[in-house]
């Protein structure tokens, strides 16, 4: 498994695991980051990743993206 922060722009991956404290995992789940869901890296800007999750685009810091494994 690799962290989402390592995915390249345009790449679509399937989330396999989310690490971190319960509150962090809950927050990510509320944003749509759940195991077995697809995420597409739209772009990278200023240390953040712009991600397509379901029908939404979400900016996520690289630090937070390291907690999401694919």
Segments and roles (model prediction):
Residues 1-70:
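Compact, glycine-rich, soluble single-domain proteins
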């Amino acid at each position: 498994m690799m962290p989402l922060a390592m995915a390249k722009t345009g790449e679509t991956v399937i989330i396999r695991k989310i690490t971190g404290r319960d509150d962090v995992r809950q927050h990510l789940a509320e944003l749509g980051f759940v195991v077995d869901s697809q995420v597409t890296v739209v772009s990278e800007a200023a240390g953040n990743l712009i991600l397509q999750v379901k029908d939404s685009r979400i900016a996520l810091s690289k630090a937070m993206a390291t907690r999401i494994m694919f």
